[in-house]
Every structure is written in structure tokens, then in C-alpha cells.
Amino acid sequence: MAESGSTNPKSPSVVPDSTLGGLKRDLRNYHDGDDSNNLSIKKSKTTKMENNCREIVPLDVTPLSIVPPDTPKLSRQFWKAGDDDEAAPVPLYCSNDAAVRVHPQFLHANATSHKWALGALAELLDNSLDEVSNGATYVHVDSTINKRDGKSSILIVEDNGGGMNPSTFRECLSLGYSRKRNMANRVGQYGNGFKTSTMRLGADAIVFSRSRGINGNNPTQSIGMLSYTFLYETRKCEAIVPTVDYELVDNKWKEIVYNSTNEWLDNLETILRWSPYLSQQDLLDQFNHLEEQGTRIVIYNLWEDDEGKMELDFDTDPHDIQLRGVNRDEKNIDMAKTYPNSRHFLTYRHSLRSYASILYLKRPDNFRIILRGEDVEHHSVLDDMMKIEEKTYKPMRSPEWPDQEEMVASLKLGFVKDAHHHIDIQGFNVYHKNRLIKPFWRVWNAAGSDGRGVIGILEANFIQPAHNKQGFERTVVLAKLESRLVTHQKNYWSSRCHEIGYAPRRKQKNYESSVTETPRPFNNINVVKGSSSSTPVPVRVFRPNVEPSGRNQIPQVETRERSFDINPEIGAKNRSYYGLGISSFKETGSVNLEAELQKVKQESAKLVSELQRQKQLLELQLQESKAKIQNLEKAQREKEVLELQLKESKARIQNLENRQEGVSTIFQQERARRDVTEDGLRKKLREASDVIDGLRKQVDTFKGKRIL
């Protein structure tokens, strides 16, 4: 990637001096005249007047780096955008140049690390949160319409952080550069997040950044365009990012020219041609959103799915950004309405608002995440938990870890408050340096219902996250942590599952399936002439595994196998039916045989009748259990309603108390002002009394003189 911001791969034509990091600058006033687009034009360009505005128009000369306009168009589907025709012509300067470059397709290949689009958006939120140390108080994620085509949507991520000066701006747009690698409490360390996230969300991005200027430097503002469409359709053989910079001199924004004015104009023309903005004034107007400092990222040509619809859904919820496709499960959305305490587990995969609310373990008090005009409320999974237990995990120190690295993780686990509904919710939210890396990590994949309802939260700063921040590097430390989490979840579930309606778990035993042979003399009766007795025949009896876990779980009611003791009389009849304890009989003719068979039929009928009675009893007990569960659910809902009403009442009381305090403060202030006024009036009254007394004395004196 060319840090100079050039759109053409050529060497500088001017020897750089020591000014501004060794780059030669030429300042020109953009406001010298009535037209903000009044630029000096180089020889290879001309101008035309349209709507009283002067536009830069290239002459009919095809540059070396651009092939004829029949080049293939970039696919609007992300997973197909990296495909290229090997037979397509290669620009002449690419094939004849021995230089090794970063090919534009690397931008797309690098972005494929983000399988999940919301994970890419989270990277941009991380960058804004890191700017809290530079004064950032908010990040606003919004969407608007592309002015160039008037119909497509564009994504905007804006914060009021410290912004970037031209040097830092180019570092941000360079691959693999990061100042955060060794900073405390910073997840970012690879210098790759901005490029991968923007290219995963859309084919193109344009960045506006304004910096106050420190250490005596003037404020600056920069514009840079990272456009895969531009690089692909112009057949560039290296990743080029056109940029233009401005500096505030005498309260006027003037351009900063590196190397040559022609190069600056090339960059501006490229940005205007391939961006959503139609003029230079449109570009400069974007800085009006930033006030004194900040960064505004505009992502356009957003990716589409296989059906031609945008991957990001801006229509379903006007205050949210959601995903279409496999990440969206309508069943989970409906369940989230029924089970509010499980809402984040059920919706974070497709809803940015839900995901952003749990993205950070703690959010700075003065920092806001605004999504399409509405604040995202911070949510802690601890608020969704009950019967919480706290564990401490301290792994064995490895030689490669720094001595100051914190090697203790505090784990909190418990049941989700909706666990008594027996819905399949479980997993651990694992954070790294305050950032959620593994949301609802399912470590125990037990058969049946074991582990359901158990969720937890911990911060593990000693494990290295992957560069896409959607998982951890597979290391021995991670494997040990996973094993320990499984152990904690099993122990917690086994000891407390009965508290949410599951059958108590006993100590597990290893029962192996076995096949044995037992003689059954009665079941193989041979009524054959010449045979005086029946010969025992081996019969296979299958003994299945016995597992102390529930089976056939459904969201509302748990069904379990129960054993009921049948009275000894029925057991004896049962044994009689299967020939256990019945001696072999001799052949006494068909009459005796029919009598025996009739007797067996009668005993079987009694046994069937008893079993039917037991079945009816079990069905009655099941209905009673369902009724009790429904009553408990109703009571739970009433409890939640009462809790909500109590919360609202407390909020109203707090509001009234605040208003009372405000009225009391106003009353005290008015009283103080009244006292001051009264003191002033008393003082004036005393002064007036003194004046009256003096006048009276003068009158008396005057009268005395007249009498004399």
C-alpha cells in the first residue's frame, strides 16, 4: 500500500525536505474566490463550467495504468468478489516491472477472516472506544442513501475522538501497522482491523479525519479512499489509497501538497470519481459532522447475499442493523419475546444492538454507543443469571508470559433466569481486556439435557485472541481453560439441576451394554409326538446403558422415565407368564394343554388390566405435573410483571425525589435572593430615615431662626 497516497505508482519528482516528516509541502488557499473547487489545473487536464461551478475534466488521453472500459465488473457478493479471470489482460507497467507489491486482491483475501459481518463492525467500535483516552465521548453507527445512485445504502461509523494527522492517517491505512501492540487494555495489536472490517462490510470505504493539532502544529484534516472497486475495475496491480490533506492556516483550510500539485489533483479526481460524493464541496461538507476533531468512516457498495439482497438489513428495525441469511433464526427471535432474560443469547448473532450491548465487560461512564440515533444500553450477563457461584482460575505460569501479566481469572456461573423453562441455553462469555471474544462459548456438548441453562462470564487476559477477535489462538493454555470450564459446568449442573425442575443427578456409573443368554423352557414348548419334555433354548436379552441424564427434553415440559414397583402378586404372575418357576409338564393330552393355555390367558388379561390401571395413574400424575408447571410459569410471569412495576415505581419515586430536590434548591435560592433584597431595602429605609431626620432638624433650625 502506498503510504504517499498516490494513485499512480511513480517515484516522487521533488526531493523531500525536512518539513512535516521529510515531505515537501505546498500550501494553497481553497477559499481564494467564490468557488471552493477553484483549483490550479495541470496541463493534462482542462475545465468546464457547469451550474456556475468549475469541474476538473481529463483530456482524451488514456493513462498507462488504465485498460479499456470493457474490464469485468466487481461482483457485489463478498465471497465471489475475490474471483478473477486469469486470462484478463495485465497492465503493461505491471508485467514489465520487477517490483514486488501488495496486490489489491489481498484486501479481499485479508477480509475473509471475518466470517461474521457483525464481528467486522465490532472492530470499528473497538477503534472508537480506544479514542476515549483522546477525548471521545461517543461512536455513532448510522446509514444513509448514496447520493451518486440515489438508492443504495451506505454505512457510517463516526466518533469524536482525537482524529488523525496526515502521518497517523497513512499509518492507519497501511497494512499491519499498529501503535497499540504493547498498550495496556487495548485489544488491537495487529494493525489489521480497519482494513479487514471495512472490506468485509463493503467493497469501498472513504475516511474523513480531523485533528486539533498538538505541540504547536496547525489543525489538519485528511480524506482517504480504500476502494476495492477502483483497484479491481482499473486493473491496478498494487493496493493504492488516494488521499488528500488540508491544514488550517489563518482560519482557512488550505491543501497540503506532497511531491507535486498534479499528484494531489490526481488523488482528488480519483476520489470524486469512485466515491459517493459528486464534488469537492460535498467531501468538505462531511467534516461539518466532526466539529473540532474526530473520524468519520463511510462504507459503500455494501455486499449482497446470493439472492441479490444486502447482507446488512436496515429495514426490519429503524434503530438497529441486522443480518439476513443463516445468522437470522426466526424461531429464536420469537423465543426472545417469550424469554426476555435469554434475549441476548437468542439475538446477538443477527442484531448489532444486541451484540454491542454485551460487547464490552465495562463501558466508560462518559462513552455512548449510538446506533441509528438511539443509544445502545450496556448489558451485563450477570443481570440474566440466578444462583450465581464464583470460582477462581489460576493457570500455571508459562515461561513466555511476562512477569506482570495477570494470571488470575474470576469466573461467575449460574442458571439463566429462564432456565426453568428448560430451553437449550448455555455457554460462557469470555472477555479479553474488556472485549468479548467468545460469546456464549459452548464447552460441554452433552447428550440430552445435561448442562442446559448454565451460563457464565469471565475475563481471561492471559490468552491470545485471534486477529479477527472472534476466537482465541488454539494453545495449551486455552485447552486447559476449556477443560476447567467443562468441569465447573458439570459440577454445578449435577449439584443444582434439581433446583430448576430436572431430576437429581446421581454419581455416574459406567454401565456397558451386554448381551447374555438365559434358558427359557416354557417359551419353546414342543408338542411333538415322541417328545416327553421341552428342551431349554437360549434366548438373547439386551441390557442397555443406564445414564443418569434426562432425555427427550422439550422447551416447556421435561419427560423422564420413572420406575414404579408392582405388587408381589403381579410380579409372581409375570414370572409365571414367562415360565420362570414353572416346571416342564408332561404331555397329558390336548385337554390338559388347553386348560393350561386358558389359565395363562386369564392371568395375562389380569396383568394387562393392572398395567392399564398403572398407565392411567401415570397419565393422571403427568397431567397434574403439567398443571403445576403451568401454575409455576403463571406465577413466574406475575412475578416478573410485579418486579417490572416495582422497578417503574422506584424510578418514578426517584424522579419525584429528584424533582423535589430541584424545587427545594430553587426555593432556597429564591429565599437567599429575597433575604438579600430585604437587606438592601432595610438599608435604604434606614438611609431614608436618616435623611428625613436631618431634614427635620434643618426645618426646626430654620423655624428657630425665623422666630428670632
UniProtKB/Swiss-Prot annotation:
Name the species this protein comes from: Arabidopsis thaliana (Mouse-ear cress)
Q: Which cofactor does it need?
A: Mg(2+); Mn(2+)
Q: Which family does it belong to?
A: Belongs to the MORC ATPase protein family.
Protein purpose: Exhibits ATPase activity. Binds DNA/RNA in a non-specific manner and exhibits endonuclease activity. Probably involved in DNA repair. Involved in RNA-directed DNA methylation (RdDM) as a component of the RdDM machinery and required for gene silencing. May also be involved in the regulation of chromatin architecture to maintain gene silencing.
Stretches with biased composition (Basic and acidic residues):
23-34
Q: Where in the cell is it found?
A: Nucleus
Assembly and partners?
A: Homodimer and heterodimer. Component of an RNA-directed DNA methylation (RdDM) complex.
Pfam families membership: HATPase_c_3, Morc6_S5
Keyword field? ATP-binding, Chromatin regulator, Coiled coil, DNA damage, DNA repair, DNA-binding, Endonuclease, Hydrolase, Kinase, Nuclease, Nucleotide-binding, Nucleus, RNA-binding, RNA-mediated gene silencing, Transferase
Query: What SUPFAM superfamilies is this protein classified in?
Result: ATPase domain of HSP90 chaperone/DNA topoisomerase II/histidine kinase
Q: Give the Polar residues compositional bias ranges.
A: 1-11
Where is the short sequence motif Nuclear localization signal located? 672-679
According to its UniProt entry, the protein's GO biological process terms are: chromatin organization; DNA repair; positive regulation of defense response; regulation of DNA repair; regulation of gene silencing by regulatory ncRNA; regulatory ncRNA-mediated gene silencing
User: Is Acyltransferase there in the keyword field?
Assistant: no
Give the main EC class: hydrolase
Coiled-coil ranges from the UniProt annotation = 590-665
Any one cellular-component term (Gene Ontology): nucleus
The protein's name: Protein MICRORCHIDIA 5
Q: Species lineage, top-down?
A: Eukaryota, Viridiplantae, Streptophyta, Embryophyta, Tracheophyta
Q: Which InterPro entries match?
A: HATPase_C_sf, MORC_ATPase, Morc_S5
Entry keyword Heme: no
**What's an example of a GO molecular-function annotation for this chain?**
endonuclease activity
Give positions of region: Disordered: 1-47
Which EC numbers does the record give?
A: 3.6.-.-
